[in-house]
């Protein structure tokens, strides 16, 4: 498996250099969760806002918590409000606290008031890590609201 994965990574690098979005969309359902994790991150990098829908589907449907976590992280890093619905759903209902935590952080990074209701509800999550992530994310929303600033600083400190 490791050798096959390395060979695939070599091909992935070539496809990355060619910015082949469809290639990485297809890898989002690959049997190897390591490949899916990489595909999520690379698709976010090369596709921008076009990556929101397929990465949101990974966040909702992938059976591996690490892959879903990376999907949440990538949606936050992309920073588009079109990713909020998928992230909010993950905060509310993902079975993994690891994913709920990252989705809450990602909502803070996006920095939109549209996420406030979800983050307020996350303050009552059963997991202390999710609750703490919601506090940090809400602090960023408060800062953005009070300063009317949505800068690189707020994106880096949003979660």
Report the location of each language-model feature.
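N-terminal alpha-helical scaffold/docking segments in eukaryotic complex subunits
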Residues: 1-37, 41, 45
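Alpha-helix N-cap/helix-start positions at coil->helix boundaries
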Residues: 2, 18, 33-34, 49, ...
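Core register positions within helices of long alpha-helical scaffolds
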Residues: 11-15, 42, 74, 106, ...
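Amphipathic alpha-helical scaffolding segments comprising HEAT/armadillo-like alpha-solenoid repeats
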Residues: 15-29, 48-61, 80-92, 112-124, ...
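Register position in tetratricopeptide repeats
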Residues: 45, 77, 109, 140-143
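Helix-adjacent hinge/juxtasegments
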Residues: 63-81
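Solenoidal tandem-repeat scaffolds enriched in leucines and small polar residues
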Residues: 126-137
